[in-house]
Amino acid sequence: MADQNDVDYEHLEYVDYKDTEFLEQFINNQGKILPRRVTGVPARVQRQITKAIKRARHLALMPYVSESVR
């Protein structure tokens, strides 16, 4: 789960799909994308994060499922 003190999400302009360490904060131990009510980010940023995670998965930068589920 993401800590709201790490990044100012209101002024975040671009979520980079290549920054997998940042994106892993928004994925649970099963590999699912955490909902906005859990992460506490604004709706616009949640949409960007979701899109970036899906792009990273498609390009094989991130797994679709975690190692523990396989």
UniProtKB/Swiss-Prot annotation:
Entry keyword annotation includes Ribosomal protein: yes
Disulfide feature: none
Example GO BP: translation
PROSITE patterns: RIBOSOMAL_S18
Molecular function as annotated in GO: small ribosomal subunit rRNA binding; structural constituent of ribosome
SUPFAM superfamilies: Ribosomal protein S18
Gene3D superfamilies, alphabetized: Ribosomal protein S18
Source taxon at top rank: Bacteria
Keywords: Ribonucleoprotein, Ribosomal protein, RNA-binding, rRNA-binding
A GO CC annotation given for this chain: ribosome
InterPro entries: Ribosomal_bS18, Ribosomal_bS18_CS, Ribosomal_bS18_sf
Biological function: Binds as a heterodimer with protein bS6 to the central domain of the 16S rRNA, where it helps stabilize the platform of the 30S subunit.
Assembly description: Part of the 30S ribosomal subunit. Forms a tight heterodimer with protein bS6.
Family: Belongs to the bacterial ribosomal protein bS18 family.
Protein's name according to its UniProt entry: Small ribosomal subunit protein bS18
Originating organism: Salinibacter ruber (strain DSM 13855 / M31)
